Structures are given as C-alpha cells and as structure tokens.
Amino acid sequence: MDYKETINLPRTEFPMRANLSKREPGIEKYWEENNVYEKAIKNREGNKQFILHDGPPYANGDIHIGHALNKILKDIVTRYKTLSGYYSPYVPGWDTHGLPIEHKVTKEMGDKAKDLSVSELRDKCRDYALKYVERQKEQFKRLGVWGEWDKPYLTLNPEYEVKQIEVFGEMAKRGLFYKGKKPVHWCPSCETALAEAEVEYGEHRSPSIYVKFPLKDKVNVGGVELTPGDSYVVIWTTTPWTIPANMAIALHPEFDYVVVKASGEKLVMARELVDRVMEEAEVENYKVVGQAFKGTELENKRCRHPFEDRDSILILGDHVTLEQGTGCVHTAPGHGHDDYLVGLKYDLDIYAPMDNRGVFTEEAERFAGMYYDDVNKEVTKILDEKGLLMNLSFISHQYPHCWRCKGALIFRATDQWFASIEAIKEEALKAIHSVDWYPAWGEERMANMISERTDWCISRQKKWGVPIPVFYCKDCGHSIINDETIEAVKKLFAREGSSGWYKYSAEEILPEGFSCPECGGKSFKKEEDIMDVWFDSGSSHKAVLETRDHLSWPSQLYLEGTDQYRGWFNSSLLTAVATEGKPPYEAVVTNGFVVDDKGNKMSKSIGNVVSPQDVIKRYGADILRLWVASSNFKDDVRVSDRILKQNSEVYRRIRNTFRFILGNINDFNPGQHYVDYNDRAEIDRWIMIKLQDLIKDVTRAYDEYEYHRVYHDVHNFCTIEMSSLYVDIVKDRLYTDGTNSLSRRSAQSTLYDILLVLVKLVAPVLAHTAEEVWQHLDESSKDAESIFLTDWPEVVNEYYDDRLMSKWDKLLEVRKDVAKALELSRENKEIGNSLDARVILVPVDDKQRQLLKDNIDILPDLFIVSQVELQGETGEGFHKGSETGISVSVVKASGEKCARCWKYSEAVGNDEEHPELCERCVEVVRTEV
C-alpha cells in the first residue's frame, strides 16, 4: 500500500506565489462589481459615526509616494472603523482651483494664452483639473483605497462654491474681512500674492551690506556730541533693492547703543555687535567713545536718506534683535511685515514703487524700469560712490520661495483683502486645546502657529478660482458685502458656478433696484481678485460635511502630512472657529514626509524618487500598504527598494501562514466538524489564548493609530507563535491522525478560528490579500460575501486560563532547552531529523519532574521527537539547559521508523497486515482505508 495516500496532506488553490500586481486588479473589480464599499457602509447605518474628512490633494500631475502614504493611512482608518462597527463613509476630494493649474494652462498655451478671454481661460483650467482628477482617481483606487469615487467632492463644483461663499458671508458678517495696503509675500514670476502656507524656504545667495546713514540732527548721547557731517547710524541688509523705499531706522528702546570712532567718523550701533560689525566690515582701527545709551535717546531724530531727497527717521521697535546686523534696522514699511507695523505707529509712508513683475515703476525715478534684482547692484554702486557703503559681501541663507515656480519671493505692499486673525485668535487657541493630537506635540505646534499668525491675505491676482464676492460703488468707492449681496452671488453660483461672475455685470448679478448702502448709488463694479485656494479647501468642512446627508459636522478625524499645520489644518480651523466657534475636527493625525533609506529628501536630480506606480507594478499595492503600516509614520518615513524587499519577505511569511491554514482545513466544515474550545487539546487552547492577546494588542494599536505595532504583532504571531511553534507541533496530528478524529478536528477548529481572526486583523492593511483569503474559504466557513462585510473579532475572555498558561509557559521553556540539544546533535551528525531522536530529561527539581511526568504523553509531539524519557541522574552526553536548568541528552530513538508518520516505535513490525507502521498509524489506516 502507498501510505502517502492515507496522509491528510494540505490541499488548497490559494497560490504560494502572490503575483499581486496581476491578481489585485481582479480583486478591485470584484469589490466594484459587487458594491462591497456601498454594502459595508449600508450595513453600519444607524451606528456610531466616525467621519474621516479627506484633505483634498491638488489636481495636478500623477500621485507621488507621499500621496500613497497618506491615502493608504486613511484607507486603513476607514476600513478598520467600518469593520469595528462604525458608520464610516469616506468621501475623497480634490483641490481644483489656483495658480499651479492656471500656470500650467498658460504655459501649455504659450503666446495664445494672451488672446483668451477670462471665461475661455477658466474653461481650459477646469478641463485640465478634471483630467487630473480622473487620472489621480484611478491611481488612488489602484492602491486599494475604497470610498465614494463616483461622488467625490471637487472645489470647482457649484454646490461647493456656494457653501464657500456662505462661509465668506458669515465671516464678513462678523467684520473679519478688510482691504488694506500691507506688505505680503509676492511672487514676481507668478505675479500674485501668496499666503504663508504657500511659501517654501530654501537656500538663497544674497548680497550682505553695511550702510552708513548720515545723521541730520545734532545730538549728544553717552557724553558724545554727534554732528552732521561726521556722524552716521549704521544699518545692515540683505535686500539693497529695498533701500530706495527706506523711511526710517528702528532701534530697540532697551538695548545699549554706543558711538564707535573709526577713520575720523562717529558710527552708532548696538554695543553688543560692535566687534562683529567691524570685523565683517574689515575695519581694524576703531574705538568705542563715551558711555552706552539706550535707543530711546535717539527717538525721532533724523538721518538723511543715502541718496533720496528725504529724511530717514530714527524710531523704536521691539522687533529689533541682536542676532545679526547692527541693532539699527533699515525700515521700509512697504517691504516688510515688522517694518509695516512699526511704520503704522509712526505714521510712515507705505512706499513700494514696484509693479506685479518686480519691476520698479516711474515713481522710483532713477530705478524706473529696472528689475528688483538688478536694483541690488545699482544701489550698491550708488552707495559706494557716495562713500556710504561700509562693506559688501555675499551670504547663503534660508529665504522664502514660491511653492509653484520655486522662484525667490519679495515682500511688497499692495492693496489686498485680509481676514483678521487677531479677532478670532483666542477662540482658535481655545479650540486647539479641545482636539486630540497624534502625535501629542501637534497641539503645541498648532498653538504656536496660530499665536504667531498675522492676518490672512486671502486675495490672489489670478482668474482660476472663486471670485471674492465684493462689489464697489462707482459713485463713492464703498466696498459692499452684506446678506443681500451674498445671497445674490450664491444664487448665481448655484445656477452657473463661479464662472458666472465673469459673464455678467455687477448690476445683473445684484438684486433689481439694489443701491449702495453708503450713498444710494446705482452703479457698481465687481472685485477682480479671486480667493486664496487655502480658503477654498479651508471651507471643505462646511461644503462637504454639511451638504451631504450621510455626513455630519464636525468630523472625527483629519489626517494629513505635517506641512498641513500651516496649511489645511490651519485654514480649516480658522474658518470653523469664525463660523461655528468650534474646531472642525475632534482629532488630528499627522504623517511625516517620505525620504530615502538614508533620510534624504526625494529628488529627481539625485535619482532617489520612488514612484508608487512602479512599486505596484513590481511588488503590488499590498506591499506598498504593508510598507505604510510598517512605518512609524508620525516621523519621516523611509522607502527604498531594500526596504520594500524586506516588506515583501514579511508579507511572504504572513501569506504562508494563511496558505498553511487554508490547506489544512480543506475538508473542514465548521457546521459538522467544529470542536468546542473546552474539548480541544491543551496546546490548541494555549494558541487560542495567545490569539486573544493578539486581538487585544492589535485592536489597541489600530485605535491609537500605531500601525507599526499591528505590523510587528501580526508578523511575530505568524513567525513565532505559529510557524516556529504551533504549526510545527500540530502538523503530525493534522497529517497522520484519523481524518475525523477529535485530535485532528480540534487542530482544524483552532486553525479555522485563527484564520477568521487573523484575516480580519490584517484586512485594513492587506486589503487585497485578505479578500483573496476570504474568497478561498469554503462557503460553509464564512458568513459574508466579502471580508469587508464581516465584523471585527472580539476577545473571548472565557478562554483565559492562568493555570494552563503558567503550565505551558514552563513546558515551552523546557522545549527551548530540548531544541538546543537537538540542534547540537544534528551538528554532530548524531541524528538527522528530530524524529530520529529519543530525548532523555533529568529535571532540576521535584516540581519540574512532576510537571513533565504529568505531561509525558504529549512531550514527544511538543518536542517533535519520537520518544521522551525521564531519568533521575545525569551522565555522559547531557547538556544543561540555559532556560530551565534541565539536563538533556539526545540519543537515537529505539525501534523502527514508521513508514507513514516517520516516528520511531518499538511497535513497528508488530502488525502482520501493516508491518511498516506504528500502532497509531495501523489503527488510522485500518479504520479509514
């Protein structure tokens, strides 16, 4: 007889090779055709809500690895919450307005762009945005991300724009908007103002100059008489092009200033900075004369502008520092925030003679028509000719750049619309402290950003966006925003979208008979600027959560990259506090940036960019998802081919665990064969208790957004508790015990229970693989058509048994000592397979002896040997175990090797019909064949 035919070998169609890149699209098709997402959400209707509100990616270009990280994290959250019983619909969104799209369209159009009407330009921008929405949508879906892909929110949709106008109107009603001439970050290349969130800081080379401003007034300070002609106040700047707009020099009221005598001149500067200034100016012979004096002693005294026909006033400002420079700060209110604020206090002119391209206007006279960067050289030349340039050098420093074109920015005063942050700052800070932040330092970071935030410049000098809904009276110039005008704009946008603003005159948009509330005038013009895109996306909590019946305000979670503390988290908080008095989110989770395995930023020029599309083609989306889960994503996340290969290896082990179980329950029908927990073998109960611990730990990790713990806990369970221990021990029972024996069905029941738990625990991460496993289960073994229509596993506390766990902890410690002895015997060629062995044990004490004696029947299976014997004394060939102190000897097993189970037994040969089999195998074969 061929005894191999009598062995219960594993059988499954679940493939060993994952081949994910080819298999996953079929699984995604199954989800789509069977409406798995829709059914999962419907199943949870009426349950407690958990709404993760999607921060909209920008509809421009293909998704990058940072997008993949963020979207997969969100998918893990919503899949887990849904499995856990929450009503957790996910509505993806896109940010579809703004400069990058307009920039791309005009660049593609070239010279033809100038001939486009506003409506034509906007139509082309809309088409461009929608093209990339569709492209990115397919890329996100290929990551395995589920959600309402057929009904996403787009910031260009009319219903969204209407809600945005409503938010604007509510804030206007509180008096939070004003128009003012203030310096803002300005991109001369893109020709528009930028918000703080659109500014990137990078290395920039700038001129560094020390300049002498001639003193105009006679004054005595520190016992030294300063007179016009030989006395100067020294300033330092890295923007010589702003000196034409200089109106004052700021000193700190509390700092000590001194007079320095050098080359017959008297120079005023901060005492603490004298040596550094003179060293950098390469002045060797100098001397401090008189005593130190406070900045207050020079307030309102006058210097002459170095080359313009006007004075430069000496003023006081707390913004002056001693970190660099001279302690005397060149002040141009039209070109700096601090300069502007101190200028208001002293009623200085907000002078910025430049156009939108960074070119000086006629107002600048000698510099008219020059680009600001060229003015640097011209100013330096003039100062040098007049003998007022103390020193010129060049420095590399962190400098603001445009997020879109990457060009250097300038500070420039222009007429802009602002939202007053000061008016709601206290409310916003209070709101921050009511939110749960992951990681916890996010709370302080956000609070600091809001505390330091200046008023929000919301106007942009572009066409592709939501127009600022303001009208101006042509008769008196009054700007008009009220309930009546807001309602008129909302009606227009609901009907035609924001493009309607450009189709009709102000009078056609406003209600019939509308008159200026200030002067009664009847002629109006519309504001030409559009809103900052951060106001677009910052209104999403109202535009999405309040307009969709199945969602609710506020959301339970915002989850974005750390750059959104100054971006979407920030703008959303401000609009929510301004309109609702509360934050729009109950919790905020942030992920770090993706870097290479050396911690370097991704860069095309370096060649270290990892594309999610390439990863999916090579490894599959589930490997990308596993990489996300393996990372402590709250810090920067490393990725490389080496790291992805490591994750592939971990995936292989998890997959092999599923395959082993599926193969060994192929003939198991839970309705007929399921063995109750209390009737199972002790090792089966032990692994079931370990499984309950796994459920607890993994559930807690998911709840705390600690997915790397899920990754490690599941991997350890598969490799340590399962592969290295339980699977090894039960293989003999599964393969060689009677097909329908209690011992085999007990092991199968346990494997079945483990599979049902394990596949659910990994489902939020390994979504495709979990579904694949589920579809390979026999219909009798599952209660739903998809893994994602099941419920999260619950801990069965009744399984816990301290006595059993204590006993098995001790037995498994002994097993470790036996395993080491077996390994030594293998190395010494004393045995081949562990089943060749007979293990002799000499316990360390009576307690250990009794434990082993009571369990002597299960020890061969536990150690995976043929025989185990207890002895009273050690002798030659014994090894003392490092775990328990037990003495272990390994000798050749007695008897003959069973042809069926490969265990040695003295009973082999006793049966005439089956002389090659041991007693156990004879009984099985006789019963079943």
From Swiss-Prot:
SUPFAM superfamilies: Anticodon-binding domain of a subclass of class I aminoacyl-tRNA synthetases, Nucleotidylyl transferase, ValRS/IleRS/LeuRS editing domain
Documented EC number(s): 6.1.1.5
Residues where L-isoleucyl-5'-AMP binds: E560
GO cellular component: cytosol
The protein's assembly and partners: Monomer.
Functional note: Catalyzes the attachment of isoleucine to tRNA(Ile). As IleRS can inadvertently accommodate and process structurally similar amino acids such as valine, to avoid such errors it has two additional distinct tRNA(Ile)-dependent editing activities. One activity is designated as 'pretransfer' editing and involves the hydrolysis of activated Val-AMP. The other activity is designated 'posttransfer' editing and involves deacylation of mischarged Val-tRNA(Ile).
Protein name listed in UniProt: Isoleucine--tRNA ligase
Species of the source: Halothermothrix orenii (strain H 168 / OCM 544 / DSM 9562)
